[in-house]
Amino acid sequence: ELGMTKKYGPFVIRYPKMSCPSEQKEFSLPVESGKGILLPCSEIVPNLCDPLLPSNTRSKILFVTTGGMYSEVLVATRSLALENVYSDIYSLRFIKPLDEKYFIELAAKYDGIVFVEDGIISGGISEYLSCLCAKNGITNFCVKAFSEKFYPNGTRAQICKLAQLSPEDIKKSALSLLKK
């Protein structure tokens, strides 16, 4: 339907390795061209984030991720909530087209942004979005992605740990942004 009703020309549907989590109602919302899915902390860990409403917290983190890294980011978000750090997840539904204006308006509301993707850091969507943020005066961010090197065989968890993409590594990156 998207390809037939919009004037974007050819496009590719990238199927993630994992399915969308059915427990998060946001993943069932209608698709808006160029926009991802915002999962507020209060929806992810409602019992822990209620007292951490954004207006009452000192700092807020936004995780921007592709579908393949959602589970690691979700664990990091829950872990941060246990330490009284409010963090939301923005799951990218689109790489292109991307509603840049919407993304910048969203990103500007946060004290730090952690971009997490299962692609190569150089030339990936995280690099693109971090440059977009910098051009718009948003500078407290970090990019978590694979460096350009060979990784040994291993389980997904082992490879993510080697690439510093484990939930614990993602959490540490978020905490380091709050210290800036």
What positions do the PLM features span?
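Thiamine diphosphate
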Residues: 3-180
